[in-house]
Design a protein with these regions (language model features):
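Non-transmembrane, aqueous-exposed alpha-helical and coiled segments at domain scale
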Residues: 1-148
Length: 148
């Protein structure tokens, strides 16, 4: 089975909404790349692109050394979200390709760390999201934005 990426998606004749690679600026810096953030928070940003023309991408930051950067980037940030449950009293069982993720970055890699800092300083940045545990965030009173 082929891994999902933009080329495979185009070949599949997928009919849903897709924001192409490099088609929007990174507007969200998200600390955490786990299932909850990608299935909930990133879903809403993806829907904002489709329904409201928000035109933004999300940069993910893995909070610990052993994260999902490689897996996410191999799929160019694309993944399939299964939506199951009830909506307006009706059973829902559908799939949506989420295309809002620009990429995933490993802060333990110097090149990725430099990219994370550049995103943090970008005028395009509108939101910072986080759902990491104490394993992923450490308070440093000596740290300041000027150090970026």
């Amino acid at each position: 089975m082929k891994k999902l990426n933009y080329e495979v998606l185009n070949e599949s004749e997928y009919k849903g909404y897709v924001l192409g690679k490099g088609k929007a600026p990174v507007k969200v810096l998200q600390f955490g790349e786990g299932n909850f953030l990608r299935a909930f928070v990133d879903y809403w940003f993806d829907m904002s692109n489709e329904k409201a023309g928000w035109n933004g991408k999300v940069a993910l930051v893995q909070p610990i050394a052993q994260g999902l950067t490689k897996v996410i980037n191999e799929q160019e940030g694309l993944y399939t979200l299964y939506l199951r449950g009830a909506e307006n009293g009706e059973k829902v069982n559908r799939k949506r390709v989420i295309s809002v993720v620009d990429g995933c970055y490993n802060p333990y890699d110097q090149a990725d760390w430099d990219r994370i800092k550049a995103i943090a300083k970008s005028d395009d940045l509108e939101y910072v999201a986080s759902n990491t545990t104490e394993a992923g965030i450490v308070y440093d009173p000596d740290s300041s934005f000027d150090q970026l």
